[in-house]
């Protein structure tokens, strides 16, 4: 590997790993996988996950005011960037302005998706930040189960 910065694509830099990724993609395409944590992600999701945003660590939350903005207001980059310059970013690490925009947009869209029965998107608190499996499972248990309910699990040992 002559280019230590790895500026080429995977097929060029490591054809063996590239071939394995293609084989795994084909395997997932041809089979119905009934393990929730291994469900097939759509191509658009895979593209987003492989974008430059994967290089960022955005600890904290975007500006709270974006919770009540419509999509077009959130996507007004010039206005948002001007606000960051004046007021600073509430996150611990700086330089995540576009990540803030993506997260605010995802947060708003999720709230709009679940707005129903007289509850508006502005009344719904949404957190779209990823969790590890254990806290995510506990959140689901707390949301859906009552004290004393039975949970079935697999013994994977």
Locate the predicted segments by residue.
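Predominant activation on well-ordered alpha-helical scaffold segments within soluble catalytic domains
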Residues: 18, 46-50, 107-111, 138, ...
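Conserved N-terminal alpha-helix of the aminotransferase class I/II PLP-enzyme fold
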Residues: 58-135
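Conserved PLP-anchoring active-site segment centered on the Schiff-base-forming lysine
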Residues: 145-157
């Amino acid at each position: 590997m002559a280019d230590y910065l790895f500026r080429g694509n995977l097929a060029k830099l490591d054809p063996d790993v590239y071939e394995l990724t293609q084989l795994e993609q084909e395997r997932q395409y041809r089979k119905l996988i009934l393990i929730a944590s291994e469900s097939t992600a759509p191509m658009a999701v895979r593209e987003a996950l492989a974008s430059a945003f994967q290089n960022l660590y955005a600890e904290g939350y975007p500006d709270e005011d974006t919770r009540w903005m419509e999509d077009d207001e959130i996507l007004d980059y010039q206005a948002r960037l001007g606000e960051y310059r004046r007021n600073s970013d509430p996150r611990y690490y700086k330089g995540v302005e576009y990540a803030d925009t993506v997260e605010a947009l995802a947060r708003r869209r999720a709230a709009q998706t679940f707005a129903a029965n007289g509850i508006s998107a502005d009344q719904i608190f949404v957190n779209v930040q990823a969790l590890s499996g254990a806290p995510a499972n506990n959140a689901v248990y707390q949301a859906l189960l009552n004290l004393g309910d039975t949970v079935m699990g697999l013994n994977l040992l």
